């Protein structure tokens, strides 16, 4: 019996959704950073095994939006709930339920699909706090079909979670070819890798005002990639921070990004990144559409 279906991973920003998917796939497909709201599009990740095919939808963290980009991110997350077979609600061991989690759970109460509670980062918290968190969530929202404490970064209980997901999947066909692991284009993933390096290396006030626009991506006569990208920011002061003294920060971002892009593309890469100011781009519908936020 072959099973298949779609699974949404949903939760507050920065609870480890992308880390979980990257762990399951053993591929760097979703941007991972310690800063919240790093995932902006619902990346579809496809896991095909002998007895099943699971299509994971990695959503932006749900939150109350502050600008048009934020509204887009929340809309994408809400749309991801429609037409899926299982919802994985992910949180971290904080004891009491926070307002952000309650905001999401009140929406999940209304859906018919099975919802799993995934408590991540158990390796970073003591067992008492983990147990308290599990009890408080179960008591407040008894609709969870399964409750699984995990560590996505340390690979703890991830296999158990995977087996439980298979248990709830319906019989179905292979929706995608066996060798396909994502529906995202290479250009999108390359842009996300560059943005991830900026998120990791830059100070707190800059990253969420950053986007990466792919200008050109082509192979040269040697079969190596030549990539030109522009990093957009909202202020002149941010541009100076991104470039750094004598171009040192931009060089570091580009160097780290190139290393990961070469691993992803399995090819030598020549990467050039420029920085451009587009004031308040996160509230400009035209720019958002140009960058692919079309929801």
UniProtKB/Swiss-Prot annotation:
Annotated stretches, region: G4: 120-123
The UniProt annotation puts the region (G2) at 37-41
**Start and end residues of each stretch annotated as G3:** 58-61
Question: Which GO terms of the molecular function aspect are on file?
Answer: GTP binding; GTPase activity; ribosomal small subunit binding; small ribosomal subunit rRNA binding
What PROSITE patterns does its record include? G_ERA, KH_TYPE_2
The residues that the entry says bind GTP are: 11-18, 58-62, 120-123
GO biological process annotations for this chain's record?
Answer: ribosomal small subunit assembly
> Region G5: start and end of each range?
150-152
Query: Can you name this protein?
Result: GTPase Era
Q: Which cysteines are joined by disulfide bonds?
A: none
Give membrane topology per the record: Peripheral membrane protein
What organism is listed for this UniProt entry? Answer: Clostridium tetani (strain Massachusetts / E88)
Per the database record, which ranges form the KH type-2 domain?
202-279
